[in-house]
Amino acid sequence: MAWYWWRRRRRRGWWKPRRRRWRRRRARRRGPARRHRARRRVRRRRGRWRRRYRRWRRRGGRRRHRKKLIIKQWQPNFIRHCYIIGYMPLIICGENTFSHNYATHSDDMLSTGPYGGGMTTTKFTLRILFDEYQRHLNFWTVSNQDLDLARYLGTKIIFFRHPTVDFVVQIHTQPPFQDTEITAPSIHPGMLILSKKHILIPSLKTRPSKKHYVKVRVGAPRLFQDKWYPQSELCDVTLLVIYATACDLQYPFGSPQTDNVCVNFQILGQPYYQHLKTALGLTEKTTYENHYKNNLYKKIKFYNTTETIAQLKPLVDATTNQTWSHYVNPNKLTTTPTSEITHNNTWYRGNAYNDKITDLPEIVKKSYYKATELAIPEAVKPTTDLFEYHAGIYSSIFLSPGRAYFETPGAYQDIIYNPFTDKGIGNIVWIDWLSKSDAVYSEKQSKCGIFDLPLWAAFFGYAEFCSKSTGDTAIAYNSRVCVRCPYTEPQLLNHNNPSQGYVFYSYNFGKGKMPGGSSQVPIRMRWKWYVCMFHQLEVMEAICQSGPFAYHSDEKKAVLGIKYKFDWKWGGNPISQQIVRHPCNGQTSSGNRVPRSVQAVDPKYVSLQLVWHSWDFRRGLFGQAGIKRMQQESDALTLSPVHRPKRPKRDTQVKEKTPEKDSDSAVQLRRLQPWIHSSQETKDEEEEIPEGPVQEQLLQQLQQQRLLRVQLESIAQEVLKIRRGHSLHPLLSSHA
C-alpha cells in the first residue's frame, strides 16, 4: 500500500500561522468638525475580553394591555388536517382577447375562434374547491365526510412563469369581494402596475436568470375569526380574490411591430343619430323609411365605393334586364368649368354612378328579405327590411371605410385616438338598449356608465361587467356602446349638447364581415344587420391594447398556470366506523396496487342536521331524536339534475344597486335589512299598495306576508347562529 502521503500530511503546528505581535494602533488624523451632536466616546478595555452584563430595564415604557385577546374554544373530539392541492389555468388569453374577462368566459364552448381573456377576477370558496375536485383538477388529502366542522388556515399559491408573456397579479383578502364599475379598469396593466402590493410574474424571456415560478403565501381573509365553523356556513365564504392580467414589460409603450401608437376607427354619421332604434312599430317604420330614403339612399356620393358593385351588381345581373353600365356615370372630367359637379372623376369629388343607382337598394332589399324569409320560415322576422345585410342602412355600401378616394365622404366619420393624451376627465362610456332611438346619455335609460377614466382603461373588461350588472348573458346582441371623449381627433363631443354620445363600429363590420374578418355571415344575422356591442368589441380591444404596459396579443394563446395548496382542518364527533373482514378470504399481505382514493363530499350537505354524531348512537342503536332530524332533512339530500350554470362559479359578483320603485309592478323582493324594524317595513309596504280590485289587493297582501315570513325566518336563523358562535361577517359571503 502507498503510505507516501503520511509524510506529506499537514501537521497542526506546521500550517498554523504565527500570531501577530500586539501593537498600539497608529494615531489617525483628526477629521473635520461635525455639525451635529458628537457621538459618545467609546472606551475600549485593554487586555482580555470580558462579557458585560447590562441592567434589566422595561422596554417600550410603561406596561400596556394586550392588543389581542386569546379566546379559547372547545375542540372537537376528532380532528383531521387536510390539504386541498390542485392546478388550474388562472388566465387563458387567446389572440385579440386581451380586454375580456377569462373568469366569465372560462366555461364557454366555441367551435372556432379565440378563447378566454387577458384578465381575470377569480374568487375561491370551499364550494368552488369542491367543484374543481369534481372536474378532477385537485385532490384532497383527507376526506371531509361526517366531519361537519371546519377551520381555514390559509393557502400557498405558485405562479408558473410563461416563456414569452408577462403577467401582473394582485391578491385581495379584504372584503367586499364585488365588482364595481372601476374594478376592471383598475386591473388594466397600466393601472395595476401603479398600485400597491402587486406581484410581477415576468416571463422567462424578460428575466431568464430567476426561478421558473413565483410563490406567494396568503392568509385568511380580513374580518375572519379563526375558530371552528360548520362546513355549510363556510361553503360560500370568499377566501380570496385574485386579480390578474397579461402585460408586456419589454415593450410597455407600443408594440415594435407597428410604427404608430394611435388607434383609428369609425363612428356613425349624422343621418343615424336620431333614428337608431331597431324594434320598430307600424308608425315608426314609415318614419324611419322616409328619413333614411331622403338622408341616406338619395345621396349619390355615398355610393362611390367598390362595395356598391359587390352588394348590388350580382342581383342586378340575375333579376333585371339592365346591364351594370346603365347605372354608371358616363360624364368625364373636362376643362370647362361648371357650377355643378357632374363628372365621374372621384378624385375631384365626382360621382361614379348616376341618379338611377338610388333605386337599386330598394329592389335588392326586398329580394333578399323575401329569400331569407323563405329560408328560415320558423324565425321571428323583423318588421322592416331597413336592416337587410346587402342594401340596408348599415350596409357596407354606406359604412365601409374604403372609398373610391380616401377623401370621399361616406355615411361615417373617421376618428383618431392617442392613448397618451387621454387624461380621462370628461370621458363617459355607457350602453343603450337597441330599443332606444338616440345616443344621448340618460340616467334612467342608459346603463353601466363609467366616468372620468381613459378609454384604454374604461373599455377593459367592460363587456363582461355589463353582462353581470344587467344579468343579460346576451348583452352583446341586445345593446350598443356609446362614448363621449374630448381627447380624440376630431373630438367626440357636442358642445351644444354635452350628453350626446357617439356610436362606433369595427372595421370588419363596415366591410360587411364578422369579427375576425370572416365573410361567412350567418343567415339570421344577415336579416338583422345593425350596430351592436358584438360588432364594437374589436375597437374596444384595439383601444385597450394601445394603453401602457398592455399585452399586444403576440401569441396565439398565453396561459398563466397556478398551483394552490389550501390548508384546512376538519373536525367533528362522528360515529366510529369499524369494518371487519373475513380473515380467511382476505387479500394477501402485499399492498394494493391501486392508489388509495379520498372521497370528498359536497360541503353544502355536511351540516349539523345531515350528519350522524356520536351522541346520536346509544346502546348500539340510533336515537329517536336523530332519526326524526334526518327524516325532516331528507329533502336536502335529493340530488338536483346536472345542468350547466349560466355563469362560472369562480367569477365575482357585481355590487347590486338599490332597486327603483315601480308603482305598476308587484311587490319587489328586496334584500333583508336587519336595521329596519319589521313594523316600519310592513307599514311602508302597505302604503305602496295601489288602488284596485279587492282580489288584487288581497293577492298583494299575501305576497307581502310571505316575504315578511321569509325575512323573519332569516332573522331567527341569524340570531341562532350568533348564539351558537357560528356567525360570520356578512361581507365575507360570496353573494355580498
Curated annotation (Swiss-Prot):
It is found in: Virion. Keywords: Capsid protein, T=1 icosahedral capsid protein, Virion. It holds the Pfam family TT_ORF1. Residues 650-664 have a biased composition (Basic and acidic residues). Its main location: virion. The keyword Coiled coil does not apply. Residues 633-692 are annotated as: Disordered. The keyword Endoplasmic reticulum does not apply. GO terms for cellular component: T=1 icosahedral viral capsid. Self assemble to form an icosahedral capsid. Belongs to the anelloviridae capsid protein family. This is Capsid protein. It comes from Torque teno virus (isolate Human/Finland/Hel32/2002).
